[in-house]
A protein has these predicted regions:
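Bacterial N-terminal signal peptides that target proteins for export
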Residues: 2-15
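Classic N-terminal secretory signal peptides
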Residues: 17-19
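C-terminal motif of bacterial Sec signal peptides marking the signal peptidase cleavage site
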Residues: 22-25
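Ser/Thr-rich, low-complexity intrinsically disordered terminal regions
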Residues: 27-151
Length: 151
């Protein structure tokens, strides 16, 4: 019974986080919508000579916004966490950015907004937060513009 109560409480907390992301996302995207994509997640195609150039821009973008880069699961993926509250928070927002090689010096960036419970513990769990998709789409567009302007 206690586990169910915790799960319901956790869902309520993530609903608040998702609502906050949706509100912020609507302000940061042009029309508040995420275009239909191959992956079903926010994505853009960036023209760049190397994955290294793209990774530098992604890292700079997120760290300048208070995100902490964390170890990713794969070489073509970057993960960034931001505590839900200042101090020792057990919840965090996570953005996963997958980088896929396309043709002719281009790279597809796929962004996935996540909520993390038990952040920085052995028992952390991730939950996708689709309400944050419009904000992540706007982030990816800005990263694309920065990379392509630097060429």
């Amino acid at each position: 019974m206690k586990m169910t109560k915790t799960s319901v409480l956790g869902l309520g907390t993530w609903a608040v986080v998702a609502l906050a992301l949706a509100v912020i996302g609507c302000k940061s995207s042009e029309d508040g919508k995420v275009p239909l994509t191959q992956s079903g997640h926010p994505e853009v195609v960036v023209r760049a000579k190397s994955a290294g150039d793209v990774k530098v821009a992604i890292r700079e973008f997120f760290t300048n916004r208070g995100y902490i880069e964390t170890d990713s699961r794969a070489t073509n993926e970057m993960m960034f966490d931001k505590p839900a509250r200042s101090g020792r928070s057990v919840k965090a927002l996570r953005v996963i950015v997958r980088i896929k090689k396309e043709t002719n010096d281009s790279w597809r960036l796929i962004g996935i907004p996540m909520g993390v419970d038990g952040w920085r513990s052995d028992l952390q769990t991730e939950t996708e937060v689709p309400q944050g998709a419009s904000q992540i789409q706007a982030f990816l567009v800005e990263i694309k513009n920065r990379v392509e302007a630097g060429q």
